Amino acid sequence: VTLLKSKIGSVRCRIERLLVIMSKQDSVGRHTPRDTSAVGLNPIKRDVMGAAMRVLTRITGSELADRYKIRETIDRITYQSTKTGFKTLGAATRTFKKMSGGASGPQRLTTAKNADFFDLTPTDDQQMITETVREFAAEILRPAAHDADEAAAAPADLLARAAELGITMVNVPEAFDGAADERGVVTNVLVAEALAHGDMGLALPILAPSGVAVALTQWGTEDQQKTYLPAFAGDDVPQASVVIAEPRALFDPFALQTKAVRSPSGYRLNGVKSFVPAAGSAELFVVAAELDGKPSLFLVEAKSKGVVIEADPGMGLRAAGLGRLLLEDVAVPESARLGDDDADVRAEQYADAVRLSRLGWAALAMGTGQAVLDYVVPYVNEREAFGEPISHRQAVAFMVANIKIELDGLRLATLRGASRAEQGLSFAREAALARKLATDKGMQFGLDGVQLLGGHGYTKEHPVERWYRDLRAIGVAEGVVLV
């Protein structure tokens, strides 16, 4: 009850602050609202009113308003702000169009200010976001995970329901109707962990568009950002992925077999990509390909000629609806290439993309590992053998303790890497450590969970066997989850 009252007070304080901001906005006058039209045809205004109304719309459309008894306050604020319009994005047949006007030059998020001390305590905003996402994962993802795993596909409305959380919007600059004013790598890691606690397979299609938004924000040109980023700040977020992995043994992301060659009109891409979540409904890909002997990233729309998508379910992550992306002489314009004009700089930017994705996969291992721990502790305390709980046996107790020890080590390494990346510091070492820990210890989390449940761990009546299969993917996965 105390925690609930605290949450209600926190939400009400935020609503009241929004009301004050709106009042100040009214005092200086508002711009004439833009007309609604097709995606990207109108300039995006950077006014506080628009940002506040987007937040209120998300809260009003969810259960939070009734749960925390703030609907009356929201209605009062909304009534005062009826002149603010909202733009609805297209459906699966969308055409990405460049927005006119707006800020000049590509928009980059600033690095976070370096604190004088190492603090693992989340900020108030991070805590609120994490709690909201964790609740979504528990109420929506966990119950749907079993059926999604059996069907090898995520629910059709999953991304739309997740869009209410604003997971993608927090990586889009304010200039494009987003909510970001600086890099939020740590926040993205916390969000990925919270979603994976519900189910890692279902977390992938939700996080994949956010990875594309990160790539566009970090390395996209002004034209690329104006064409694609506005779509990632709305309620109809396109299914999109950063695809790096290729279907071959001992895959090295820095030795790509997908090739890009120059053509009179731009580039032509050939190759095969794997680990593409929700591949059948994807609209946009950021494809890693080798250009002139060095890796680069290219924007490829799903409707491009020569793009073929095949289902490719695996042992784990079946709920993600994994597929393969076949690129057969796909022509893209020169403007489709992400990153700097200098090949060496572009290669380093690609390396950062790989490192960010490895931090993302480590975060998924953290969330799933925590799910294993939370599941086995009550089980070993309640399961009795020879007249006492099996947790009284040292072999069992030590195994549970080791999960917690290794999980905390993985979490520390991942958060340290995320913190350094957020501050614009080198994080190559930390990303490598997080990758190694996630690969080795993550798989051990799943294995120990199955062992602790005994025969039950091998059956689908318990989710631990699914988590074990999902965790085995950490060592071979690349891309997708850029934080």
Task: List each model region and its residues.
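A short core secondary-structure module
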Residues: N270-E310
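Short, contiguous pre-domain boundary segments
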Residues: P106-P122
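C-terminal helix-coil-helix/basic helical segment that borders enzyme active sites and/or dimer interfaces
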Residues: R142-E150, V377, N381-E388, K404-L437, ...
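Internal helix-loop-helix
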Residues: G102-P106, R134, E164-D236, A278-L284, ...
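A short, Trp-centered hydrophobic/proline-enriched beta-strand micro-motif
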Residues: D235-A245
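Glycine-rich phosphate/cofactor-binding loops in nucleotide/flavin-utilizing enzymes
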Residues: K24-R108, V191, G211, L453-V483
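Glycine-rich beta->alpha junctions and the first turn(s) of the following alpha-helix
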Residues: P122, I309-G409, I474
